[in-house]
Amino acid sequence: MSAAVVRRLALNSPRHTIISRRAVHLQPLCGQQYVKSKLRNWTCLTFLGESVTAGSSIPLRKDAKPFKLAVKDNIATADFPTQCASQILSSHPSPFEATVVRQLRERGASIVGKTNMDEFGMGSHSTNSIHGAVRNPLAEDDDVSAGGSSGGSAVAVRLGDADVALGTDTGGSIRLPAAYTGTVGYKPSYGMISRFGVVPYANSLDTVGFLASEVKPIHDLVFKTGLYQEHDSSDPTSLPIASRKRCAETTPSTLPDLSKLNIGIPLEYNIEELDPSIRDAWVAAASALEAQGATLVPISLPSTTEALCAYYVLAPAEASSNLAKYDGVRYGKRGEGSDAVGETLYSDTRGAGFGDEVKRRILLGTYSLSSEAMDNYFIQAQKVRRMVQQDFDRVFRLDNPLYEPAQFDLSDMAEATGMEDKRGPLQVDFILCPTAPTFPPRLDEIKEQSSVDVYMNDVFTVPASLAGLPAVSVPAKVEGSRFPAGLQVIGQYWDDQRVLLLAEKLKEAVA
């Protein structure tokens, strides 16, 4: 199918409107050892002085190569406080180090600092932080969003202060900042990279990922050093070794010639709110892949329209449980109230320690889990999440290695529907779509937006998060704009290596 046909069917006339919204994560750290880089118009907080090789007691692997690493401030490090950009964890020292940080130290990482973010990862613009908003370095004379919640990590990479940066992606918190800052953002398959030592926002969605200026450093770090093979017994969501072997056996590790690949163009991602320049970049990228031999196939992912709504029920529900521990007794900076009255102590501590967006999501999540709302909201959102997973499984050529093909649920389709329509043609190897519907907004514009408007930034990133799929955002040049467009490659579960390899080819084609 030619690019012209795909353009006519999928891109030219937007037929879909957004019925859902969402947000992300980003955080910094502070203390007397840190300094804000105001000269560069951002608030990523970095270590003042030499890079920290410590954890220097950690033995290096034989294949270790030195590189500079920035770490998002919700990932525990032994040498820096872990504050999640929150007053309630101000100057909190971590008693241990995250598994992924240790793994990267073994591979030669020197930590240059912790990066600013949205408080506890709740936000899409890295503005909900006790350290101030992160600013986009692509707009030197303007205050523009760097995306969230891993905005500080993206900026550290963009400015060259770090070769690789760690972030977390719950609903797009790595990919959105990558799109806004012109960097590469990779969200691995859920369960591939250890979450031990990551301050949780939503356990079933949180995924540790990577940002860099190019795809290759990420690919080499994850696959050439065998990071993707390492199970962590300390993390109950880390995929077991037996499951990793099964996934590896069913998933190719090399990318064939593009003439043998089918690239899916999802119709539902062509929404009315999509900026025309980003739509043009999407079309140009699809055409570039077709010119190299790939076949473009329009596909339908009908549950996309409900994905954002489901995310903003499920993620806050999990957050309300995860953040209950911050009460001034077990964790968190204690409020000023009397210790004798428990209710006052808790309310004073949480009222003063949490920011407005965190409070909003705690309240939303608590309500979703209440007896009056559980069936109508939380359970329904779980059903939508399963439908999103089924949509992806139906269009990918590879079967999901976590499920037996016979387990595919067709009960929600009409009896008269033919089997070929139920399963779909299974003809797509990868999906190509925008990362964000718009270019980064100014910070003063964000202040005037409603929470729902802010959540809408994640409409293209949330579906892959709900399904636990690998996704990579790469920048595409846009004529007449100082900002690139973020384009996203999504693959079947555990097809991460080929997703990265295709993303590398895509980045070269649209540079």
Swiss-Prot record:
Catalytic activity of the protein: L-glutamyl-tRNA(Gln) + L-glutamine + ATP + H2O = L-glutaminyl-tRNA(Gln) + L-glutamate + ADP + phosphate + H(+)
UniProt xrefs under SUPFAM superfamilies: Amidase signature (AS) enzymes (SSF75304)
Keyword Zinc: no
Species name: Fusarium vanettenii (strain ATCC MYA-4622 / CBS 123669 / FGSC 9596 / NRRL 45880 / 77-13-4)
Enzyme category, top tier: ligase
EC number: 6.3.5.7
GO cellular component: glutamyl-tRNA(Gln) amidotransferase complex; mitochondrion
Active site: 72, 149, 173
InterPro entries the record matches: Amidase, Amidase_dom, AS_sf, GatA
Subcellular location, principal: mitochondrion
Pfam families in the record: Amidase
Annotated function: Allows the formation of correctly charged Gln-tRNA(Gln) through the transamidation of misacylated Glu-tRNA(Gln) in the mitochondria. The reaction takes place in the presence of glutamine and ATP through an activated gamma-phospho-Glu-tRNA(Gln).
Keyword Ribosomal protein on entry: no
Protein name, as recorded: Glutamyl-tRNA(Gln) amidotransferase subunit A, mitochondrial
Cellular compartments annotated: Mitochondrion
Subunit details: Subunit of the heterotrimeric GatCAB amidotransferase (AdT) complex, composed of A, B and C subunits.
Source species, domain of life: Eukaryota
